[in-house]
Amino acid sequence: MLGLVEKIFGSYSEREVRRLEPIAEKVLSYEDQMARLTDAELRAKTDEFKNRLKNGETLDDILPEAFAVVREAAWRTLKMKHFKVQIIGGIVLHQGRIAEMKTGEGKTLVATLPAYLNALEGKGVHIVTVNDYLAKRDRDWMGKIYEFLGLSVGVILHDMGPAERKKAYAADITYGTNNEFGFDYLRDNMVIYKEDMVQRELNYAIIDEVDSILIDEARTPLIISGVGEKSTDMYKLADRFVRTLKKDEDYVVDEKAKAVSLTEKGVAKAEKFFGIKNLADIENMEISHHIQQALKAHAIMKRDRDYVVKDGQVIIVDEFTGRLMFGRRYSEGLHQAIEAKEGVKVERESKTLATITLQNYFRMYKKLAGMTGTAQTEEQEFRDIYGLDVVVIPTHKPMIRIDHPDVIYKTEEAKFRAVVEDIVERHKKGQPVLVGTVSIEKSEKLSAMLKKRGIPHQVLNAKYHEKEAEIIAQAGRKGAVTIATNMAGRGTDILLGGNPEFIAKRKMLEEGYSKEIINEAAGYGPVSSEEVRKARERYFELLEEAKKETEKEHEEVVKLGGLYVIGTERHEARRIDNQLRGRAGRQGDPGESRFYISLEDDLMRLFGSERVKNLMDSLGIDDDQPIEHKILTKQIEQAQKKVEGINFDIRKHLLQYDDVMNKQREIIYAQRRKVLEGENLKDSILEMVRSIIERYVEIYTAGSKYPEEWDIKGLLDHLYEMFLEKDSVVIDVDLDRLDKEVLTDIIYEEAVRQYERKEAEIGPEQMREIERIVLLRVVDTKWMDHIDEMDQLRQGIGLRAYGQVDPLIEYKKIAFDMFEDLIHSIQEDTVKFLYRIQVNKDNKLKREQVAKPVSTNINGEGDNKKQPVVKEKKVGRNDPCPCGSGKKYKKCCGANVK
């Protein structure tokens, strides 16, 4: 039915594109008018637009003319002009949607249109890229357009200090990576002076490679951590316990969902081993958490696939790029559990000071938009979770790439032999080949096989840097063979015949020019010195030579069929396969793609290889004989759809849990901002006092409506101990006239008198600052502990499913109670401190951070920062158990430690 409707009316994207075409035509109609303006007149348009907005016009009203101004500025500064389809892409982004644009269609240039338009409001625009290299490249490259039009441009890079960051955020348009934007938000909510905050309000973000950031990275929380105090003994103990368990008997593994859980038998073994009655009890949360992480380390995490052990350290392997993530650690104690499993030194668990998922960070922007070459397969997720719809933008020239059907082999060895033969054949005739692999290990295996055959090639697994961009840019040269892990080099176009700009820059390096001079020389902005002016002349000479060379080679490569892309395995997500395919056939060039698959590949092993294997066996097919059929390609796509569905459900499920924490975070951060913004907190403090008194009046009068039966002495003793002066409250009301409200009023009036006295003693101005210092300190300390507790609750909540309770409902209920306890605890500690504080009038008080951040879980790109070394305190047998049960260590987790 849907197919019939689409045939008659066109797909959703086609209808949307048709609807936006008249606006794009209007933009193009300004071309001659803009071309007649001088540079100064074109620049003056920016102020004219700002004034029109002040006078009541909207961004939509000025869009056609503003886009036309950017188009002309791009031509004058970069000799680039937006095509009609790029203008449509720009409109889609301005509307807060996702524009799916194929590789090579100029997404970087498209973003300049909505970025300029939205920056006119003066509230800031963030352009989000996947790595520092692209952020800096795009700021320097596209920044020329904005600066020509009088707007300021900033970039946030990993190693920048707070002052530089603040300046970059104050710019009209700011480039940076998703991680840097997210971490700055967290750091801003840890500062103790408002002036130390670097970000402005989160107004409008354009996310490049939006699928990579909002889907592939969505499950990765950003974590800022400090040094924890917990002992690491518990990890070793949990590891010892897990080694005694039998798979399927004591625990079950769900490979598809990457989850592991104890069976009832396993739970009984845990209770016996740790000497506890009920593992699901709230006081055993810590033990349950450690067991869960040890199970995950043994049953789910595989050495040399998920992590490697190098120089006595466990180093994570990025599942999407195959890179080693130096300085990054798994959170929630999983890293320590793997260290215990591998027998290396178990590093002390860091304490989480602040955390947020990318999903929740980006949902805070007033308006969000994204660009990618592949979003349609995840359209439902973008719509459900972010409220973003996907519009597929047509290509500027028709797509003529040939996508061959998949070829399936029985074994991985046979598959790789076939891949090598294919590469050898293509290389002989000079056709460039790009091979995509799923891991470093597979890249190296293929590289070794090609070396044996004497085929020259480049291997890309390294961390992101300019060298990688250069290799990927030259992957379209005649006879080039490039092996790359899935996402390596994203953001850089592969031009058939080679990229003349990279060739010219390399020649300048060989001639002895510095990188800084080359980068400035290759630009279009004003030159900073005579040296740069001469370098620019030389650069354009070399560029012309390189263009002649690449144009000739381009023709030859086109005749050979263009770039040939080989996929050595199907990824779990069709989108990642489409990204690899999309490297070929850019901007109307010819190209080919083919996937080689074996029944031993992860996807085939988990989903649907049985039927294919039986078919191959029944036909008596040997290892080196492939099968190739469209039906099989369809079956593989079905398997991928199944995995995508599972992964979407997991992300949605995680988001439901994370939403609980997110609401709590918003409340705490909003309160914190009020404190920083210098509000008079006296009224808030007295409200806390009243709230505490009401709460305890309720507790001590519960069970009876008769005042003579109330425990008034117990109530007052408790409040004296907490914050009031001893014996200061006089209740001179007849019992028959006493009710809870009257009792609360009497105590509250005395509490206010005591607070006024304290203020008179210290001085009002000093008292206001003390209120701020105390409240910040208490909120931060309590919030950090609360993050840990919520984390453990989430880890252990699965055990509740045994009691036929929906874990999510139970989690929400307990989390609500815990948050209420947190608020009460903040109130009580704040009031206690303020009533008891002793301050010398002449002393100048200073605010201090509760905990110093020492690391983030994502240290830039391959940034190998040493973690601080922390001296570990040994737990004595009679000390309180580090698991938090309240028992002595020897009676609890130390019962099995000799």
UniProtKB/Swiss-Prot annotation:
This is Protein translocase subunit SecA. It is an enzyme of class 7 (translocase). Part of the Sec protein translocase complex. Interacts with the SecYEG preprotein conducting channel. Has a central role in coupling the hydrolysis of ATP to the transfer of proteins into and across the cell membrane, serving as an ATP-driven molecular motor driving the stepwise translocation of polypeptide chains across the membrane. It is a peripheral membrane protein. Its cofactor is Zn(2+). May bind 1 zinc ion per subunit. GO terms for cellular component: cell envelope Sec protein transport complex; cytosol; plasma membrane. Residues 862-877 have a biased composition (Basic and acidic residues). It is found in: Cell membrane; Cytoplasm. CDD domains: DEXDc_SecA (cd17928), SF2_C_secA (cd18803). It catalyses: ATP + H2O + cellular proteinSide 1 = ADP + phosphate + cellular proteinSide 2. The keyword Cytoplasm applies.
